[in-house]
Amino acid sequence: MRSKAKGLVRPLITKPVQPLSSHMHLFLLCILFLSALFLTLSEAVCNLQDRESLIWFSGNVSSSVSPLNWNLSIDCCSWEGITCDDSSDSHVTVISLPSRGLSGTLASSVQNIHRLSRLDLSYNRLSGPLPPGFFSTLDQLMILNLSYNSFNGELPLEQAFGNESNRFFSIQTLDLSSNLLEGEILRSSVYLQGTINLISFNVSNNSFTGPIPSFMCRSSPQLSKLDFSYNDFSGHISQELGRCLRLTVLQAGFNNLSGVIPSEIYNLSELEQLFLPANQLTGKIDNNITRLRKLTSLALYSNHLEGEIPMDIGNLSSLRSLQLHINNINGTVPLSLANCTKLVKLNLRVNQLGGGLTELEFSQLQSLKVLDLGNNSFTGALPDKIFSCKSLTAIRFAGNKLTGEISPQVLELESLSFMGLSDNKLTNITGALSILQGCRKLSTLILAKNFYDETVPSKEDFLSPDGFPKLRIFGVGACRLRGEIPAWLINLNKVEVMDLSMNRFVGSIPGWLGTLPDLFYLDLSDNLLTGELPKELFQLRALMSQKITENNYLELPIFLNPNNVTTNQQYNKLYSFPPTIYIRRNNLTGSIPVEVGQLKVLHILELLGNNLSGSIPDELSNLTNLERLDLSNNNLSGSIPWSLTNLNFLSYFNVANNSLEGPIPSEGQFDTFPKANFEGNPLLCGGVLLTSCKPTRAKENDELNRTFLMGIAIGYFLSFVSILVVRAW
């Protein structure tokens, strides 16, 4: 019997694979389809109603800047600016499309997106009224920002009836600022009565009227910010605002509010910013205001407040900005103000404050950058302690009664950029300029109405090579300074605005003034200047082509009254100054150079009150930006160029008291100029003078010459025709 061999392995026998039946094929296909369907359903797909609402919204807006490229073939939760929640039906919760250049209207379909919690359409061009029921239907909305658009009309705030006043809304931040909205914000609003979670409410820069809606402090106890500024709100500030105990910001400036500031405001212990300027508020500043220990900014300027600055103002140790200017505040500056060591800006301009300033410890105000005490009645010398405020960039003491000289200690203010000391009783202009030229960052220097009857230093080497390296505005007007226009001014190669008016400068206008590369505003009026207008003056580069510059803002506004109008003109930016040449009331002779036509940027040209002769140059018509042209009280002759009617921006034109003749142009702006602006020219006619223009002998001769020449031409023509006819025969 044979035994089995050890290790013998049985061969593996495999059966052939049977093909799947048709039923099995169908089963597997169903499995694959269901799997794919499951995977598809598991991905976020936005709610169908929300999708349709978004499509409707997009159809109402357009943008050439950044159009909405919403691809309808993909899920709307993936569209730009759209966010959905994690629920199974993926509701839209956020629409965020700020600064997209969107124009059009806000579609009411947005109200159908019921779970919307944030809507931001700020900084666009949307217009029209807000849809009816807009606020109350979006009861899940927490953040609404429609600021910086052009929405108009009244707010669609439904009034409460029956139990509707018990509705509550989720809104926390509501910003409708910088639109064209109007009407009153009523206490009976269903929506505003139910905003129990509201933290920030901003309706600034609109046209709302009626009383400030202070009732919101009762319905919205969480309020932290209220901004009603730049509207037409009127009436008194309500005591109810004292209920907003969590308020940190209260802004209601630039309205028509009246009455006193209610004492309840001083219970707002969390308040950091109190902004109530440019109203009609009266009364005194209550000393209880010093209880607002967290206050960082207090702005009550441009009201009718009176009395003294609270003596305990120094208790506001967190104060960074104190602006009480343009009121009727009197007394002295409290010494405790030196305890406001965080103060950065102090503006008490245009009040009735007085006394000396030497006792105030300015040395404690090391953060102070801007100090404006102008237009008060402060006396004595410019306090040396000010020069220990090392951070100062701008100082104004204009319109006071300060005496003495400028101290060399001013050089310790290494960041000083703006100095306005006009209309005081300062002396020694030579010493002042010798010192101040060392202020390396000084860009604005206004010393007008000081140094009476002194002689200005004139030599070119008076100014060191690095003196006034950044000076852009220089004013010494109305000082009655003697001498010639100083030669050292040629070294002010950064100067853009120069006022030398109302002095006693003699001699001719130096041609080198026309070489100052950035000069675009020059006032030489009311001096004793003689000679002719230099041609070089009309080659000022900054008046020939527009210059684009940075650092346009001034640290403090500048006030000018060049035409003796009732109010000063305020300039907050350097390039708010109109490109100007004033050379009024001097003793200039000769003609107006034709080179004047090169100054195409010029807005104002006034040469009145001189002895200029010759004709009005036709080249003036090249000054297409010209707004004022005054050539009155000279000896100009000839006619008024008709080409001046092409000056479309010309709003003032005066040629009275010259020797002009002929018709006054009757096109363009010339029909709007008053009769008085042409009087004193006996031979002028027509236009607003309503006198007929008789043809002059020269014109009659011209007509005869034209007739004679026309006759000769016709004779030649007829002779030529006769010759042709004869030849044809």
Swiss-Prot record:
InterPro entries in UniProt: Leu-rich_rpt (IPR001611), Leu-rich_rpt_typical-subtyp (IPR003591), LRR_dom_sf (IPR032675), LRR_N_plant-typ (IPR013210), Plant_LRR-RLKs (IPR050647)
Alphabetical list of SMART domains matching this protein: LRR_TYP (SM00369)
Cellular compartments annotated: Cell membrane
Keywords: Cell membrane, Glycoprotein, Leucine-rich repeat, Membrane, Repeat, Signal, Transmembrane, Transmembrane helix
GO cellular component terms given for this protein: plasma membrane
Extracellular topological domain: 45-707
C-cap/acidic domain, as annotated region: 690-707
Family classification: Belongs to the RLP family.
Name of the protein: Receptor-like protein 2
Organism whose genome encodes this protein: Arabidopsis thaliana (Mouse-ear cress)
